[in-house]
């Protein structure tokens, strides 16, 4: 893999992470608005619910990023195997 490809993948991954972070932030704001309307903002249960919701959102983000990276690794492995077999078939004597 060339250096440029690695840089582009890194920047793309960071961009996806920023989008996911923005989505989590937006969900958190909606959730906090709902909780502030239904629960007292300084109550113990408000803090507990907020912490659990944050953990679940970050867990979903982590699992999604792991899934995306595994799919990318599988695709790269399959491409490498195809390229290897293509090189071997081209170099074999006829």
UniProtKB/Swiss-Prot annotation:
Extent of Basic and acidic residues compositional bias: 74-84
Induction of synthesis: Expressed in the late phase of the viral replicative cycle.
Keyword entries, A-Z: Glycoprotein, Host cytoplasm, Late protein, Membrane, Signal, Transmembrane, Transmembrane helix, Viral envelope protein, Virion
Transmembrane segments: 46-66
Positions of the UniProt region annotated as Disordered: 74-94
Membrane topology, Intravirion segments: 23-45
Membrane topology of this protein: Single-pass membrane protein
Topological domain spans for side Virion surface: 67-83
Gene Ontology terms: cellular component: host cell cytoplasm; membrane; viral envelope; virion membrane
Residue ranges with Polar residues bias: 85-94
A Pfam family hit: Pox_A9
Domain of life according to the entry: Viruses
Function, in words: Envelope protein. Required for an early step in virion morphogenesis.
Family affiliation: Belongs to the oerthopoxvirus OPG135 family.
The protein, known as: Virion membrane protein OPG135
Phylogenetic classification of the source organism: Viruses, Varidnaviria, Bamfordvirae, Nucleocytoviricota, Pokkesviricetes
Gene: OPG135
């Amino acid at each position: 893999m060339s250096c440029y490809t690695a840089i582009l993948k890194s920047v793309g991954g960071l961009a996806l992470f920023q989008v996911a972070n923005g989505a989590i932030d937006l969900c958190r704001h909606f959730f906090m608005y709902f909780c502030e309307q239904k629960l007292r903002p300084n109550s113990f249960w408000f803090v507990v619910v907020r912490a659990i919701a944050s953990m679940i959102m970050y867990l979903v983000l982590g699992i999604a990023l792991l899934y995306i990276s595994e799919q990318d690794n599988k695709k790269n492995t399959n491409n490498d195997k195809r390229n290897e077999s293509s090189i071997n078939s081209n170099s074999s004597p006829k």
